[in-house]
Amino acid sequence: MAAGLREFAARELAADRAIHLLGIALGITGAIAIVVIAAAMRRLGDLPPILIYAAGLLAMLGCSAAYNMFRTSRWRDWLRRFDHAAIFAMIAGTYTPFTLLGLKGTWSIALTAVIWAVAAIGIAIKLLKPHRIETISVGLYLALGWIGVVAAGPFMAALDPVTLSLLAAGGILYSSGVVFHLWRRLPYQNAIWHGFVLAAASVHYAAVVGVVVEA
């Protein structure tokens, strides 16, 4: 969850800190719960994509919390790099249960490979040469986030309507939150943005649970 660059008032930082702490708590609890769900259903073969999803989610939440909560750290530049890189990992990780457990055949392999190839390039650039794509970062995140529309037909055929609706709703929440991410002068802008991210991640979590149950 990348942060804005302006200085925030103490009350704004407190609100943002609360959002991050809630996110970490929910993320850890949710990651454990979804693994337990898969194990309880004897779906051990489903664990790799679930673990990838959980790792991407926790990476985003953890890196965002570190960057936004430790604002005076001498490692701030690197915290920012990891914060931004983790967004690519989160997007690709979120797609993984749907592409590997939901889709079948060529679509499953091809879409997973493309998503992770783009994410890997984005992660590498954000860690090593972050300023190269700074001005188009938001566009790249949105493009990767909505890349699944190219497989709209296969997804509609493979996923339960409720799961599909949750997947789309999460994407809409993420995209809507970008407005507040860019609205730098709005009071509590950063906390609102991160609230949208947490809400979207929660909706996508419900969708992942759905695809695990369906698989």
PLM-predicted stretches and their roles:
Residues 1-215:
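Multi-pass alpha-helical transmembrane bundles in non-GPCR membrane proteins
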